[in-house]
């Protein structure tokens, strides 16, 4: 519905399809051809489909008192949301809200440039990859998802106490701006297709 209503978006999606790699081509018994293409979601495609609310955010420099110039070991470096206990399926633009409905992670906190290049978050089934651990750093905040919400169940609801911890974390603006958020899911779409 979104692509059909905007010729610019439709043209961009068509260009992405033209640039995609052919993965599989087969013919069915009724003489139709089935084609599977593979393309990256990052870059131009995300630039087209991410909502306009995700804007460029200037880099904020958090100033520490002169005596404390080195990074504190207690400083949080990212956010991990465990959504394995709920039926949440990956979406391009997830929103995290508290039980009271306040937005904890949304367009307000995300830099468009970073989201376009790297995605709004990363979805994983296990925290065993070095890249995954590197993405959220050595000291991420970990929270559990309570349930889904919002249109199409594209929002994750977390507890008030977890939301309070995140909101009181000074460095959250830095790691959220950089989209250093991982959502742990029970299955990714690739796992479901197999």
Question: Whereabouts are the PLM-identified features?
Answer:
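Domain-level marker for long, solvent-exposed, non-transmembrane regions
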Residues: 1-194
């Amino acid at each position: 519905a979104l692509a059909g209503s905007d010729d610019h978006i439709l043209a961009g999606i068509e260009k992405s399809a033209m640039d995609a790699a052919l993965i599989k081509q087969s013919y069915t018994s009724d003489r139709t051809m089935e084609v599977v293409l593979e393309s990256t979601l990052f870059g131009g495609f995300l630039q087209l489909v991410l909502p306009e609310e995700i804007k460029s955010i200037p880099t904020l420099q958090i100033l520490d008192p002169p005596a404390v110039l080195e990074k504190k070991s207690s400083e949080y470096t990212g956010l991990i949301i465990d959504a394995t206990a709920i039926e949440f399926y990956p979406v391009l633009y997830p929103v995290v809200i508290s039980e009271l409905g306040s937005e904890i992670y949304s367009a307000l906190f995300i830099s468009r440039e970073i989201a376009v290049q790297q995605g709004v978050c990363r979805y994983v089934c296990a925290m065993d990859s070095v890249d995954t651990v590197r993405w959220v750093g050595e000291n991420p905040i970990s929270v559990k998802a309570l349930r889904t919400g919002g249109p199409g169940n594209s929002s994750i609801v977390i507890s008030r106490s977890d939301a309070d911890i995140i909101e009181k974390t000074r460095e959250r603006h830095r790691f959220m701006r950089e989209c250093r958020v991982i959502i742990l899911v029970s299955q990714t779409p690739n796992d479901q297709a197999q």
